[in-house]
Amino acid sequence: YERTVREEFQRLKDSSCVCIFLNSVTGINELVNSLHLEGESRIFCSEEGVGKLKDAGFTNAVSSIDYPLAKYNFFTSRFYSAVDIELNVKPDILILTNLNNAVYTTVDPYTEAIQIQGRFRRMFEDKQTFNSLTHITNTCDLGALSREELDKQIDEYKITYQSLIERHNKTTNSARKTSLKQQLKQICEDYLLDERLNIDYFGIDNKYNEERVKSYYQSGEKLYAAYEATKFFRVNYEER
């Protein structure tokens, strides 16, 4: 992974503008330092991330888009959607996923990858909005559950939940209510319940999506197939 990333930055050394999407402030900071990009880069991330970077000695980090951009511009996930990036030059886009350091750097080809390229709306003379889009990732078994496995898991949780919540609602003893609440929180996964201990259907939908995306990163072939299945990208797949 690290060697491939270095090779890609070398390939893009003559690009006027490179926009790198990596959902890890720590990963971005390590990359900037290892490639000696401090004087040519800007980082766009959360306020908390800006604070961490300043503590680490990197001052060119902000929490909202402002211009001009640098040669190398790093964005965390809050900039994957909703924010337009306006440029006078056609950028090269680089998406990075490093599962060895942060599982949350995965990118969903069906949503986030499409949203990322959609941040660049200016169409140039060749009818394109960017020069290239490259996604570099390592792969591993993240223990993704199939939809059928997750169905069964959630069904079992719901049976347990229903039993406990009925006992909770029937009892008038405050100590019993407290005990049953604690049992609910211990037995059920976080995504299953909202703050009021009701079934969180939005959380359940997110869990299905999370497991779906994790399954793509079991191999390069599976991720390639997912990109192809979107019918949005013309994909060239290379394994190194």
Annotate each PLM feature.
Residues 28, 65, 71-93, 115-126:
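SF2 helicase motor core recognition
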Residues 100-129:
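Conserved SF2 helicase motif VI
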Residues 23-26, 42-60, 76-78:
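Conserved helicase motor
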Residues 2-36:
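Conserved strand-helix element at the start of the C-terminal RecA-like helicase core
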Residues 8-16, 36-37, 61-70, 85-89:
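Flexible, charged surface loops at secondary-structure boundaries
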Residues 126, 133-134, 139-168:
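A conserved SF2-helicase RecA2
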Residues 22-25, 44-48, 93-100, 136-140:
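Short loop/turn segments at strand-loop or loop-helix junctions that form parts
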Residues 154-240:
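The feature captures the C-terminal accessory region of ATP-dependent helicases
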